[in-house]
Amino acid sequence: MSVINEAVEAVMDLIDAMGLFSTISRGALGTGNGLVCEVGPSGPESVYLDKNQYLILDLTINGKHNNLFTLSEAMNTIHEELTMRKVYPGGESWQIVDITTLTEPQKIGREDSNAWIMASALNVKVYTML
């Protein structure tokens, strides 16, 4: 699996461990309550002569729930817990160094089914090692 996909899966595992109203998946929001993430425009912040690099992954987090408070609590918890961690997961050739908030969770709309939708974005800084 690629470094980017491994790092995203590791972040998803951290979110799932929070015990929110839903586990998180990749892709688009479905018809029911849920949380999803996907990588947005991203790239290396620094590249070294040995080709190790710092990647900045812009990770979009979207959520949907019939109860706005439940959704807001989940989205804010994701940001608070991920950005306040002191230890992040890593793999054989990569290590998450830091996670910061790019865009705070914000309400972006309501579906005809009365489900609220919120969106946010995280910067996931990953050090890759060849």
Predicted regions located by residue number:
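Short, charged interaction patches at domain edges and termini
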Residues: M1-D13, S42-Y54, W94-L130
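Small/polar-rich, solvent-exposed N-terminal microdomains that initiate assembly or binding
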Residues: M1-K51, E73, R85-Q95
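Beta-hairpin (beta-strand-turn-beta-strand) motif
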Residues: S42, K64-N66
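Active-site-adjacent structural patch at catalytic or cofactor/ligand-binding sites
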Residues: L55-K64
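Mid-chain, well-packed structural core segment of small domains
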Residues: N66-Y88
